[in-house]
Amino acid sequence: MSVKNIRNFSIIAHIDHGKSTLADRIISECGAISDRQMSSQVMDTMDIEKERGITIKAQSVRLNYKFNNENFVLNLIDTPGHVDFSYEVSRSLASCEGALLVVDASQGVEAQTIANVYIALENNLEIIPVINKIDLPNADVEKVKHEIEHIIGIDCKDAICVSAKTGVGIKELIETIITKIPAPKTDDEAPTKALIYDSWFDNYLGALALVRIYEGSIAKNDEVLVMSTDKKHIVQDLFYPHPLSPIKTQSLQSGEVGVVVLGLKTVGDVQVGDTITLVKNKAKEAIGGFEKAKAFVFAGLYPIETDKFEDLRDALDKLKLNDSSITYEPETSLALGFGFRVGFLGLLHMEVIKERLEREFNLDLIATAPTVTYEIYQTDGELIKIQNPSELPPVNKIDHIKEPYVKATIITPSEFLGNLITLLNRKRGVQVKMDYITPERVLLEYDVPLNEIVMDFYDKLKSLTKGYASFDYEPIEFRVGDLVKLDIKVAGENVDALSIIVPNEKAQSKGRELVSAMKEIVPRQLFEVAIQASIGNKIIARETVKSMGKNVTAKCYGGDITRKRKLLEKQKEGKKRMKAIGKVNLPQEAFLSVLKID
């Protein structure tokens, strides 16, 4: 196949704007799958992807299409739409020459779409606006065209209107891909360079790398070098990606997309964004933009049954084979026993991983409140980074603390603007920009501490705007914050898993809310249980769970009052002793109550 007849493109869309359905339609139109074999959402392979309607891993498919009596190869490179996976998006888009910008005709441009379009523009991609779901009764094509032009600045006079559901406009769309998106620029004589834009683990073949060949070529049995690790491997097999079963090939030429089998044991050896080159004709430098995926959100995961600790370790090891962005290290908690402090790309990533651990490995887990990385500047000049509030040094050793900030982009119907600004101010947000896209819709940009977003910001945003607002964020920098550690004591014992880091001005109110929420949850004991919130040695809030009364004088019929007094005194003594050594078992809800306070 001549390079001039290859088109590499991806689809950019917000969740629920019909990206996976559109991909399925394009695959079907190109005849790669018969209608009988077509399962809805061919490109989404994980159960969670299909259930939640999101794409987590980047998938690819090679399609053949005949146009003007010429055969063309279309490589559709699917990208995750969600903010947590934006690094995978950037690598997928770097493998393309063009992108379809898909916008729902009834909903208009959303926040995540903007973030991904900017990545595409940075990579100089040819962008084709596609307005989907034109079959819906409330579709407003002209309004959506205006939004795309106003927010993103892309000319929409040639936008393609399609319905992925009914198939309207799909043929015209494929022909536009061929005529508008340029063929790959290649240099067959240059040393081989291949960009890994996805990798996953196969039980039979080991870690597989999905690559786009930029220059040169790779053939079976070649000795190749992974540039960030400097490790050499032999190419055992090469495939073209196909939705049903991959197609074997002897070599991959420049401009092509394919799967490289190197017989590796973990995906950590072929990380997304890395470059593969030949040992015998080594490239001088790697393709730019490689970053190791960084965890932003951390949480403790503990098995409810303490003897399942090793099972949890095995499960995390297996997930790590397929997702090198997870980080984890063992930690112990006085309240919860042995578990792991796990790092995630973001909140959705955390939910998906926890769900996969419970579903695929049959584990029952307690997750502590999510936290972020803090930079602690100590009085002796040392800088330490912590992810767990219980690691915070004593107050007298801290000079100042820096916390991570993100740039939050929100698009909302204007009727909810007042509520949203109140929420963002409460979350310590700083307004950067406010722009009316149309009289009914507003674009907001705010700098917000990441810690305020990881708790429950997304849920609150959705409930305040009846689900109509969309939200996206990207990390910007660390800034100094006036922060303190809030500890919770139950029956005099510090419950380390409930410690949180909060802004000083909110500590008092958060402490009060937490102890009153805990009071409802902690079961009554035979002795009084004090629930206290403290900063250092200072108690700032307290609630008491009353004891259950036991009538010790029930068997004492009539008779001497001193006898009754003696029994009551004895009970008092017993309760005192019990209180000193009593253990209170906290239910799972107690650890979740931290998430619910505002």
UniProtKB/Swiss-Prot annotation:
Residues 4-185 form the tr-type G domain. It catalyses: GTP + H2O = GDP + phosphate + H(+). It is a peripheral membrane protein. It is found in: Cell inner membrane. Keywords: Cell inner membrane, Cell membrane, GTP-binding, Hydrolase, Membrane, Nucleotide-binding, Protein biosynthesis. GO terms for molecular function: GTP binding; GTPase activity; ribosome binding; translation elongation factor activity. The keyword Protein biosynthesis applies. InterPro entries: EF-4 (IPR006297), EFG_III/V (IPR035647), EFG_V-like (IPR000640), EFTu-like_2 (IPR004161), G_TR_CS (IPR031157), LepA_C_sf (IPR038363), LepA_CTD (IPR013842), LepA_IV (IPR035654). SMART domains: EFG_C. GO terms for biological process: positive regulation of translation. It holds the Pfam family LepA_C. It comes from the Bacteria. GTP binds at residues 16-21, 132-135. Its EC number is 3.6.5.n1. Its main location: membrane. One of its GO terms (cellular component) is plasma membrane. Belongs to the TRAFAC class translation factor GTPase superfamily. Classic translation factor GTPase family. LepA subfamily. PANTHER family: TRANSLATION FACTOR GUF1 HOMOLOG, CHLOROPLASTIC, TRANSLATION FACTOR GUF1-RELATED. Required for accurate and efficient protein synthesis under certain stress conditions. May act as a fidelity factor of the translation reaction, by catalyzing a one-codon backward translocation of tRNAs on improperly translocated ribosomes. Back-translocation proceeds from a post-translocation (POST) complex to a pre-translocation (PRE) complex, thus giving elongation factor G a second chance to translocate the tRNAs correctly. Binds to ribosomes in a GTP-dependent manner. This is Elongation factor 4. It comes from Campylobacter jejuni subsp. jejuni serotype O:2 (strain ATCC 700819 / NCTC 11168). The lineage of its organism: Bacteria, Pseudomonadati, Campylobacterota, Epsilonproteobacteria, Campylobacterales.
